[in-house]
Amino acid sequence: MLDFYADWCVSCKEMESFTFSDPRVRAQLDGMLLLQADVTANSDADRALLKRFSLFGPPGTIFFDAQGREIRGLRVIGYQNPERFLRTLSLATAP
């Protein structure tokens, strides 16, 4: 899972405070490889990374399969509450 984050991003803060901190979400994330791209500086490299994944800005969460291919249709753009994010995680981890 690749999560795009920035300190100035209000929705990113909501994801951290409400969704990623939820014990049910944490349990589902256990065992997954979690990466966070901090694009706070909005540098050329940050913008290039966002562009590479066709994102306008954070927050954005992208899921990959065991072979490193993006799981199409499961991107999370913007804030998702814990219940909705759990449904997304279930789809991402389905066999």
Protein language model features and the residues they cover:
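Typically the conserved alpha-helix immediately C-terminal to a functionally engaged Cys/Sec
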Residues: S11-D30
